[in-house]
Regions:
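Enzyme catalytic cores with a strong preference for nitrogen-chemistry domains
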Residues: 1-269
Length: 269
């Protein structure tokens, strides 16, 4: 029995390694954890400082095809349109072989609605792919019964625009051979989002601002949910957070690489 378990275990490990190689054989991936303080009212200079730190942690090789994953909330209060003033900074440091995933507030010009979005941009900061968060945090990202409560001066607690509108599409992000299921922040706790996703999903990417939790166990709980989702769906999981645990988790729930809470740097996939 012990011999059978050993043989089966060895086969599973080898199978995982082959699957890992197949998932990322065409594009190199870097997961970034910047460890920014949670701050409101950031000015242009502070946002530029954040960009420069993200670039330093990304350490881009202009000749290497790479997907960089930055967390949610790194441009606190700034919308996608407002950070376009840093286009030259991105173009100077990244090449046409690079794509960047990050979280930002996005305005739909036609409807006037704001979304909490995961964006995939090129080295011109042009949006290549996007995903709008579907599970919004009550009072944090939208105000329930807003038309009634705003009469009493109530508003959502997060900085920036009025209530976000939830996304209505279960859209995967396709990049080369990566079929990515995008999850923003606490969407990782909702199993139904993953169960209803594209059957060809071969990678789950979760970006999160975990600074909201402070010194509580919140970031650790978020991280544990990521492990559960990878096992339940037999899928590799990449997690990029600010102030939380960033990690690469294989399809069996094993932690291949990680950056701990309040640790800055990058991990490679």
């Amino acid at each position: 029995i012990i011999l059978c378990l050993f043989i089966f275990g060895s086969q599973e490990i080898n199978k995982n390694k082959k699957r890992l190689n197949k998932v990322n054989e065409k594009i190199f991936v870097k997961v970034i954890s910047p460890n920014f303080d949670l701050q409101y009212g950031l000015n242009k200079k502070k946002i530029e400082e954040r960009f420069n730190k993200l670039i330093r942690y990304s350490n881009p090789d202009k000749d290497k095809k790479t997907l960089f994953i930055w967390p949610e909330g790194v441009f606190s209060g700034y919308s996608y349109k407002e950070i376009l003033i840093f286009k030259k900074l991105i173009k100077r440091n990244f090449s046409k072989k690079h794509l960047i995933i990050f979280g930002a507030n996005r305005l739909n010009i036609e409807s006037g609605n704001f979304y909490n979005s995961m964006l995939v941009v090129d080295n011109n900061l042009e949006i290549i792919k996007k995903y709008d968060k579907r599970k919004l945090v009550p009072f944090g990202e939208f105000l329930p019964f807003e038309n009634i409560l705003k009469v009493f001066g109530l508003k959502k607690i997060t900085e920036g625009h009025g209530s976000f509108i939830k996304g209505n599409k279960n859209n995967n992000i396709i990049i080369d051979n990566l079929n990515i299921l995008p999850l923003i922040c606490y969407e990782v706790i909702f199993t139904d989002l993953i169960q209803k996703s594209d059957l060809n999903t071969n990678l789950i990417v979760n970006i999160s601002e975990d600074g909201w939790f402070g010194k509580t166990i919140g970031p650790d709980q978020h991280f544990v949910k990521s492990i559960f989702r990878s096992i339940e769906n037999d899928t590799f999981f990449l997690r990029s957070t600010n102030k939380g645990v960033s990690a690469i988790i294989d399809n069996k729930g094993n932690i291949a690489k990680r950056l701990n809470r309040n640790e800055a740097g990058n991990i490679e996939f």
